[in-house]
Regions:
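Acidic catalytic/metal-coordinating carboxylates
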Residues: 34-38, 61-64
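Short hydrophobic/Thr-rich beta-strand motif most characteristic of the beta2 strand and flanking loop
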Residues: 27-34, 42
Length: 123
């Protein structure tokens, strides 16, 4: 079985650390980033199966990440998380082809299930 590559982008270190630890226990290869700029540079070097990104970050936001991912790798699934969930944010994300959308605080069990569904869609 090949190992799936997951990228997590969130400006809260605790979210990145928690996601990395939990997802690595499931056997995923996980890379985390505290802002989008180095994450997008890494995406140009390496393909990821799923990208989990915060919606609201300084500099490049989650919607810009979503557009960049879909431009580079149209079949890579993007999961968005945010502490600022509202209907407009959700609609914008869904129009941008986000796979799933979660409010913070992030529930790791839900994230794991969403990642598994995203990977199943890719098969």
């Amino acid at each position: 079985m090949s190992q799936y590559r997951i990228m997590v982008i969130d400006d809260e270190k605790i979210v990145c650390d928690m996601a990395k630890m939990s997802l690595e226990q499931e056997g995923y290869i996980v890379e985390t980033f505290l802002n989008a700029e180095p994450a997008l540079s890494r995406l140009k070097e390496k393909r990821f199966d799923v990208v989990v990104t915060d919606y609201k970050m300084k500099g490049i936001d989650g919607m810009e990440v979503l557009r960049a991912v879909k431009r580079l790798y149209p079949d890579t699934e993007v999961i968005m998380i945010t502490a600022f969930a509202n209907l407009d944010t959700l609609i914008e994300a869904l129009r941008g082809e986000v796979h799933d959308f979660f409010p913070k605080p992030l529930k790791i069990k839900e994230l794991k299930s969403s990642i598994q569904r995203a990977l199943n869609r890719k098969r």
